[in-house]
């Protein structure tokens, strides 16, 4: 933090971008290995977030402190305005809710909270099988990254709060 403000406006300025038309993406869903690729991507996402969380926790323990704020921003996303983090409740997971995700799902583009709240959010990988089963029972056989994060918070009693932060994926 510099002057109590996290500056994120410089986080993503690509030199080039490859645009994949939605029709091409939709056709990919018909490919025979699509499901296994998607599951691999989801597992990789949760594993990577968990590993980053472990590094953060090791640093906190080694230096005998807890971060006031932990911010998780997807590397391909760009916040469209400055966020004054100290205005928000750090005991909950705050997230960009401007997409109005259904069923209480938690958008995974920009998420932040105190060390404890984000520890639960970022540790979803450790409980994926149990969380998937809960999601499948509650949502008719379906689950998603957004649902898994929500269920992890529910299991550990961590609240979540959407905010109208506009976060874009520059490739779209």
In which residue ranges do the predicted regions lie?
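ER/Golgi luminal nucleotide-sugar-dependent glycosyltransferases, focusing on the catalytic module
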Residues: 1-172
